[in-house]
Amino acid sequence: MKSENYAVALVVLAGGKSARYKGNKLLSEHPISALSLIQHSVGEVVSARNDLALTSELPITVVTGKWHDSVNTQLKHSLCKVSELPISIVHNANWDEGLASSIRTGLTHLLSLSSLSKSVSPTAKGLCTRPTHVLFTLADLPSLNAQDFVHLINTSYANPNHIV
């Protein structure tokens, strides 16, 4: 999927407090992959990005909150080393303000990364450094897989002026 007019950034929201779970649910084991839920969720996003050969140099952004240290450790010791794609782990210090605060943190991070680039046009590799679209997903949705993300991104690509 290469287009000068379309570049999607991927943001995984992992900043909740897991109040009903009574602990860090993102470290619980995924029933199928046997990975921690955070490893599984980010892994599916990485797979979708790789499947589509997305046109963005931006890393996948993972926004953490209350459980930043343990989530950061899980990802640093697994997916970040395996994936050729960089993964940015960003701590939302205001996680207790709710989901909107994590979305804001993710967008602020994306804007800071893309502001380092002087143009919206693709690089020599044909990759965009500024997103035209952002896909947000929650880290605690164990049934979502790479194909679900591929479908959402393809639908967005086909309908770039609509929210998907």
Predicted segments, located by residue:
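Conserved donor nucleotide-binding strand/loop of the catalytic core
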Residues: 83-97
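Intrinsically disordered, low-complexity terminal tails and inter-domain linkers enriched
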Residues: 32, 47-56, 77-85, 111-130
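Conserved beta-loop-beta/alpha segment of the NTase-like Rossmann-fold superfamily
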Residues: 97-164
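Acidic helix N-cap motif at the loop->helix transition within catalytic regions
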Residues: 69-77
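A generic structural signal for alpha->beta connector loops
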Residues: 24, 56-57, 84-86, 160-161
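Hydrophobic/aromatic residues located in beta-strands of well-ordered beta-sheets
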Residues: 10, 59-62, 89, 134, ...
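Short glycine-rich anion-binding loops that position phosphate/pyrophosphate groups of nucleotides
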Residues: 16-18, 67, 95, 139-142
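N-terminal glycine-rich phosphate-binding loop and ensuing alpha1 helix
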Residues: 2-69
